[in-house]
């Protein structure tokens, strides 16, 4: 994964640079695997483009990255790339057994501070119906995740969070809902259920 990211960084360097961070369940030691399904594990990565002067539109940024990923897919055994609403997804497929070995979801994000001093994040959203790309603010559920997770750990609720996340992930039938969203929902539900918001 790191090798393909380094190649993509070099490929797009003439236009813009970017940093990346592995986020989601992997970064929190919550990778899951359901042996009964045809879906292997997945990873979530945030890509932070360095476009301080807003030289590139959201469409230019995302399509440039897709083109670069596509160039290196086969070299690293990835067989498919998808341009989803919130992420770019690449997959390693086991065609013989008709299953996904693993997939990686790349969200293109920008962290910033608003006028009131709050840390915020926006992501590039692809509207398939209108074939348009825009920067959109993250949903409220994505904010303060680290603080909520610390509270969950302090309250010894980590097993409850793992159980809820596993249940949500294994029963998820919405192909557009990625594990990072399911994890954030699980964190917020545990916080709501056990009194974080009181």
Predicted regions located by residue number:
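Short glycine-rich, low-complexity/disordered patches
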Residues: 7-23, 74-90, 172-185, 194-198
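Conserved catalytic core of two-metal-ion nucleotidyltransferases
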Residues: 12-16, 62-114
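Short, extreme N-terminal leader segments that mark the start of a protein/domain
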Residues: 1-7
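Right-hand nucleic-acid polymerase module
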Residues: 82-84, 97-198
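Glycine-rich loops and low-complexity Gly/Arg-rich segments
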Residues: 44-48, 70-73, 130-137
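Short, conserved charged micro-motifs
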Residues: 53-63
């Amino acid at each position: 994964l790191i090798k393909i990211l380094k190649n993509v960084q070099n490929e797009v360097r003439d236009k813009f640079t970017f940093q990346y961070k592995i986020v989601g369940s992997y970064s929190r030691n919550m990778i899951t695997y359901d042996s009964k399904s045809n879906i292997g594990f997945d990873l979530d990565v945030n890509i932070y483009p360095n476009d301080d002067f807003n030289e590139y539109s959201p469409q230019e940024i995302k399509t440039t990255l897709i083109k670069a990923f596509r160039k290196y897919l086969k070299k690293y055994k990835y067989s498919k790339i998808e341009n989803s609403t919130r992420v770019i997804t690449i997959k390693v497929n086991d065609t013989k057994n008709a299953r996904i070995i693993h997939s990686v979801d790349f969200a293109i994000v920008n962290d910033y501070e608003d006028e009131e001093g709050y840390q915020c994040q926006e992501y590039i959203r692809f509207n398939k119906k209108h074939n348009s790309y825009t920067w959109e603010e993250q949903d409220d559920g994505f904010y303060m995740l680290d603080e909520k997770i610390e509270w969950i750990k302090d309250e010894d609720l980590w097993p409850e969070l793992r159980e809820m996340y596993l249940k949500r992930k294994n029963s998820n039938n919405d192909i557009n809902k990625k594990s990072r969203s399911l994890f954030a929902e699980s964190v917020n539900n545990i916080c709501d259920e056990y009194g974080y918001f009181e």
